[in-house]
Design a protein with these regions (language model features):
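Hydrophobic face of amphipathic alpha-helices that form TPR/SEL1-like repeat modules
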Residues: 1-29
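A structural signal for short, well-ordered beta-strand elements
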Residues: 24, 38, 60-61, 93, ...
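Structural signal for hydrophobic packing residues in well-ordered secondary-structure cores
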Residues: 56, 60, 75-82, 86, ...
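Rossmann-like NAD(P) dinucleotide-binding subdomain of oxidoreductase/dehydrogenase enzymes
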Residues: 123-268, 303, 321, 394, ...
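ALDH superfamily catalytic-core signature
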Residues: 195, 230-374, 397, 437, ...
């Protein structure tokens, strides 16, 4: 019997009677159908907005320390259920257990950051800003917020959004990816268990119709999105046109730049983790490797080929020791294999073909290395979102930086070097938002904002960190005078 995943509207978990379309949820490691999710629409979004609006009236005036206390309880429940959550992520997403634990851990870090809301949302004051005038700024919640999240991080990305939004005094509607709804449901159940009042956090499942309804609904004031650049731009444009605050994180083509003086062993570990972790399905995956100089490139082609030949690609729901799991579904598998099959026609060389490492069932593509990729080809321009590392051979650091800066994306880039001068030039000249020096995945922790540039981000204020607090609050400035003997002076 199939498990149908319910919506959360107010305090009620329910599958809407009016919904007639459902899509299957697969275990990517086996292809097994493990449930189905309803494709909801405007009616369900309206119900969620109504519940969130009612809850906002009381939650927005709940003292910040009380909101923080609920988040502290939530954080404790997340820790108690850590292993269960990680295995749920592995089951519906396919990443290895260790990667799933990292997914959950990074989400919990955002909850921990949000627990400090009593400090984070403090305003500013300046007594006697003018004669007998005191000035105070306050940060206040903005209203009903919405989040639209992808399949690649079922725990972390939703928790980039709703804990901080709710900590700031807002209410929230989450539309998780229809491919991975199980983790989101469990996260919401634990928040209820922590004592969160009904209607503060709601979940509506669905596809394009729900996305557009959230972006256009007059009762929603802000929309957060993570996904492809094509849909990020759509969400940003549609939401902005309807008067909403929007932060929309899109795709990426992150570069791993290896200098001749890079330390071999730590650099190898960093490249493998960056390019092939989570089967390459993350917006901070290293997907372009630039070995500066032919000798450097030749050495790294050999090192990587030897390491990849020992990779264990397996069913992550059954083998906790697998190095890599599947991609999310059959469509993703077909698309990634298409990039590999088309490589020779663009003049590139398949240096290591991971397709032969793939298990017979499930949606697998083994770790693959493609050398001599040229600018202007699809391997350079497009986000593959799979375990394929494209290798390029710039002659100098200057040439590498120039090549990187032609790209339309601007999420992350890393340099591996022992030279402080090279690292400094790299950090000064690269045009993207998150940089690593001898770090393979330069994704910031919750204390800092996730700062994509160019077509990797649409909006002004990023997720996480203080920018996240600013996104989910608005500023009020109060000028007050309480003097006994007021004499009008200079317009005051």
């Amino acid at each position: 019997m199939k498990t149908t995943i319910p919506n959360l509207i107010g305090a009620r978990w329910e599958t809407p009677a009016s919904v007639t379309q459902f899509v299957p949820i697969h275990n990517p490691s086996t292809g097994e159908v493990i449930g189905e999710v309803p494709l909801c629409g405007q009616v369900e979004v309206d119900a969620a907005v109504n519940a969130a609006t009612r809850a906002f009236a009381t939650w927005s005036v709940t003292p910040a320390p009380k909101r923080a206390a609920c988040l502290f309880r939530y954080r404790e429940l997340l820790e108690q259920n850590f292993e269960q959550l990680a295995r749920l992520v592995t089951r519906e997403n396919g990443k290895t257990l260790e990667e799933a634990k990292g997914d959950v851990r990074r989400g919990i870090e955002v909850v921990e950051f949000a627990c400090g809301i009593s400090h984070l949302a403090k305003g500013e004051s300046l007594p006697q800003v003018a004669d007998q005038i005191d000035a105070v700024t306050m940060r206040e919640p903005i209203g009903v917020c919405a989040g639209i999240t992808p399949y690649n991080f079922p725990a972390m990305v939703p928790m980039w959004m709703y804990p901080l939004a709710i900590a700031c005094g807002n209410t929230f509607i989450l539309k998780p990816s229809e491919k991975v709804p199980l983790t989101a449901v469990r996260l919401a159940e634990l928040f209820q268990e922590a004592g969160l009042p009904e209607g503060v956090f709601n979940i509506v499942h669905g596809g394009r119709e729900v996305v557009d309804a959230l972006c256009t609904h007059p009762g929603i004031v802000a929309v957060s999105f993570v996904g492809s650049s094509r849909i990020a731009e759509h969400v940003y444009t549609l939401g902005s046109r309807h008067g909403k605050r929007v932060q929309a994180a899109g795709g990426a083509k992150n570069v791993l730049l290896v200098m001749p003086d890079a330390e071999p062993d730590p650099t190898l570990r960093a490249i493998l983790g960056s390019a092939y972790g989570c089967a390459g399905q993350r917006c901070m995956a290293g997907s372009l490797l630039m070995g500066v100089g032919d000798q450097t490139a030749d050495e790294w082609r050999e090192r990587l080929g030897a390491a990849l030949s020992e990779f264990k690609v397996d069913d992550t729901s059954a083998n906790d020791r697998a190095d890599m799991g599947p991609v999310i579904d059959g469509a993703a598998q077909k698309r990634v294999i298409g990039f590999v099959e088309g490589a020779p026609a663009s003049g590139a060389e398949i240096a290591f073909d991971g397709r032969r490492l793939s298990p017979d069932r499930g949606f697998f593509v083994g770790p693959t290395l493609i050398d001599r990729v040229q600018p202007g080809t699809n391997l350079f321009e497009e986000e593959i979102f799979g375990p394929v590392l494209s290798m390029m051979r710039p002659k100098t650091l200057d040439e590498a930086i120039a090549m990187m800066n032609t790209h339309s994306y601007g999420n992350g880039a890393s340099i591996f070097t022992s030279s402080g001068a090279a690292a400094r030039q790299f950090t000064r000249e690269i045009q993207c938002g998150m940089l690593g020096i001898n770090v393979g995945v330069p994704a910031p922790m919750a204390l800092f904002s996730f700062s994509g540039w160019n077509r990797s981000f649409f909006g002004d204020l990023h997720v996480q960190g203080l920018e996240g607090v600013m996104f989910y609050t608005r500023q009020k400035v109060v000028l007050s005078r309480w003097d006994k003997n007021y004499v009008r002076s200079q317009g005051w």
